[in-house]
């Protein structure tokens, strides 16, 4: 996930006692049009992004780079003297409240305002005269008044977009260079063009309806509660309930609501993690987020995510690497504008991840099974009606990228779930698994569409893949992660979801796999993805593959529960729930197992991508729903 960080490491302190405890995670608010980040340890808001992702589009000067970065307007926004505050989400929502001795501040991005808007308000403590103080991320180039009293339009060097400041209370004279000191409450609204300033003021005025800042926060909270779906799971304690609610919030924050237009087709995409890390939509992580939305009952958001897969464009960039087959679903991830991004690993190669195609068919089939929405299959998308797009640009290229093995088929060599480097591509059991699952779902979809030839083709391919899987990946009574032998994937955390999907049913093989998972157990108490084979500490994966990976923990806990080992499963789950409760109900990508400069902190501290989305809240929600189904 966070391979995109710079891969040059400082010296690593391996001993537990040499690493200080990690600071509490930063809090993120968002409304589908942008993000803002609050850092409790400094009592400061540190970022305000004008888009709900980190990278807008490809960089034509560096096609294998991260892309054009989304504007961030602020480096630091605080009040009074710099100092730590106690911050948390209000009632498990996206509203952040920070308290210090000299006052209380509230930050949120409202869902009712269809713009990248951040509302901030400050209530000074008695006999305190706290005022907002801002450090802009880029030098201020110009500012001008816009119509109403106190409204200002700011332009910055190096940022094409503008920032509109609308006071929500009385305005006073502010020190030079500190416009936010003029009022205790503001709306900060990012604008793509300065000419949009007056329409934005009108939109804001309608949304505000004359309410003061405190009432705006109350109304936002009430509207958010109305949006929530009634939980379909029983909670065993309050911590589980709060983590469910906060996870539901994170899933909503992570989804783009930006409308599609001629130069942007990202509406509905869901990022894999929220800032401060790289907030980018990965096909795979988004599938787990979408599945959580489906099963929770958030049909509108799930439908938007599915449409996003089929409207993203341009795609099919890697046709030469996939036997010339044109395809719709990105082989790795997307830029914010919906352009396919074939993930660059900084080793000079793109990635091919065929499991993505099966995962999209999986979530599409599950959505249609739950909601019976025939109109979705007829919806106009980038490559025609959605059903035909799924058939011709997911199923056909998927089958075209299978290979004969024994009496069956397996998916061609790729980089799969753990994003291996393309020069190290292998035949992964997980990619063949997702092809089996996805084609099984598509057979049902084709039946709904009355397309018998496509249904039969999917079923035939599914059956051949089942045969190929058994021959290729079950050897000597053991389940292996790859066709190619090797210590790294012989026991692999990805084997657990394979079993949970029902691809492997032999109790002896399942039991052996669970027993061998002890080879992946780490000092923090959970499990890593694989046994890393890198020997150079300067390589990112040398450290990354030593840390505890929560997605594997969730999957193993579910398998243990199915095997009747309820006590072990509950202990694994409650450990994650308890650690999240101590950190604003945020679920990280990983826990520190081997402390180092890249993943600092004490053993067991949250690390990696924080807050995670699909592999965090999505995985947690699905785990509780699976537990409910097994009651």
Where are the regions that the model predicts?
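Terminal accessory carbohydrate-recognition/targeting modules of carbohydrate-active enzymes
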Residues: 2, 22-239, 284-285, 294-300, ...
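Long, well-ordered core segments of solenoidal/helical folds
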Residues: 247-260, 298-321, 329-330, 369, ...
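Bacterial N-terminal signal peptides
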Residues: 8-17
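Acidic/His metal-coordination segments adjacent to aromatic residues that form catalytic metal sites
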Residues: 268-275, 331-351, 405-427, 476, ...
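C-terminal capping/lid segments that line or modulate ligand- or cofactor-binding pockets
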Residues: 25-72, 278, 333-356, 360, ...
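Extended ligand-binding clefts on enzyme/binding-domain cores
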Residues: 314-342, 351, 426-437, 448-449, ...
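Well-ordered alpha-helical scaffold segments within catalytic/enzyme domains
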Residues: 228-236, 249-250, 287-300, 348, ...
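Aromatic-rich carbohydrate-recognition surfaces in CAZymes
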Residues: 214, 278-402, 432, 611-627
């Amino acid at each position: 996930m966070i391979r995109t960080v710079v891969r040059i490491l400082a010296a690593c302190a391996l001993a537990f006692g040499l690493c200080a405890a990690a600071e509490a995670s930063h809090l993120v608010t968002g409304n589908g049009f942008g993000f803002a980040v609050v850092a409790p340890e400094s009592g400061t808001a540190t970022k305000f992004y004008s888009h709900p992702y980190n990278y807008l589009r490809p960089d034509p000067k560096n096609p294998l780079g991260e892309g054009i970065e989304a504007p961030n307007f602020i480096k630091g926004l605080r009040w009074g003297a710099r100092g730590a505050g106690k911050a948390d989400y209000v009632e498990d929502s996206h509203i952040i409240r920070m308290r210090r001795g000299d006052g209380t501040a509230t930050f949120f991005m409202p869902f009712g305002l269809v713009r990248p808007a951040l509302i901030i308000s400050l209530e000074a403590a008695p006999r305190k005269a706290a005022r907002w103080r801002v450090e802009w991320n880029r030098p201020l180039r110009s500012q001008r008044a816009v119509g109403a009293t106190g409204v200002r339009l700011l332009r910055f060097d190096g940022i094409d977009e503008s920032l509109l400041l609308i006071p929500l209370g009385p305005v006073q004279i502010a020190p030079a260079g500190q416009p936010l000191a003029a009022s205790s409450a503001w709306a900060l609204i990012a604008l793509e063009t300065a000419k949009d300033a007056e329409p934005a003021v009108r939109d804001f005025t309608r949304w505000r309806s004359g309410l003061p800042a405190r009432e705006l926060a109350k109304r936002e909270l009430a509207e958010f509660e109305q949006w929530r779906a009634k939980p379909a799971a029983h909670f065993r304690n309050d911590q589980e309930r709060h983590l469910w609610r906060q996870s539901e919030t994170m899933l909503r924050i992570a989804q783009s609501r930006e409308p599609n237009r001629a130069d942007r087709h990202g509406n509905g995409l869901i990022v894999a993690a929220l800032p401060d890390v790289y907030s980018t939509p990965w096909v795979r992580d988004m599938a787990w987020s979408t599945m959580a939305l489906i099963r929770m009952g958030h049909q509108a958001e799930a439908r938007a995510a599915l449409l996003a897969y089929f409207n993203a464009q341009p795609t099919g960039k890697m046709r030469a690497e996939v036997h010339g087959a044109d395809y719709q679903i990105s082989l790795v991830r997307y830029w914010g504008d919906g352009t396919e991004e074939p993930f660059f690993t900084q080793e000079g190669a793109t990635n091919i991840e065929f499991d993505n195609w099966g995962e999209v068919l999986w979530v599409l089939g599950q959505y249609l099974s739950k909601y019976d929405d025939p109109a979705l299959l007829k919806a106009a998308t980038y490559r025609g009606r959605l059903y035909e797009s799924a058939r011709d640009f997911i199923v056909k290229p998927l089958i075209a990228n299978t290979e004969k093995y024994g009496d069956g088929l397996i998916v061609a060599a790729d980089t799969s779930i753990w994003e291996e480097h393309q020069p190290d591509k292998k035949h992964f059991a997980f990619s063949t698994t997702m092809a089996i699952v996805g084609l099984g779902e598509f057979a049902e979809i084709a039946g709904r569409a009355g397309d018998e030839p496509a249904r039969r083709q999917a079923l035939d391919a599914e059956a051949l893949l089942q045969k190929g899987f058994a021959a290729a990946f079950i050897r000597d009574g053991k389940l292996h992660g790859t066709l190619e032998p090797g210590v790294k994937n012989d026991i692999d955390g990805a084997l657990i979801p394979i079993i949970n999907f029902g691809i492997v049913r032999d109790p002896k093989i399942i039991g052996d796999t669970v027993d061998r998972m002890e080879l992946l157990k780490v000092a923090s108490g959970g499990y890593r993805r694989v046994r890393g084979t890198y020997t150079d500490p300067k390589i990112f994966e040398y450290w990354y593959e030593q840390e505890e990976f929560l997605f594997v923990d969730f999957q193993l806990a579910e398998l243990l529960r199915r095997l009747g080992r309820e006590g072990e499963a509950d202990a694994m789950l409650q450990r994650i729930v308890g650690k999240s409760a101590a950190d604003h109900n945020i679920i990280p990508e990983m826990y520190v197992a081997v402390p180092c400069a890249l993943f600092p902190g004490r053993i067991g501290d949250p690390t990696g991508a924080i807050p995670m989305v699909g592999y965090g809240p999505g995985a947690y929600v699905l785990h509780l729903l699976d537990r409910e189904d097994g009651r």
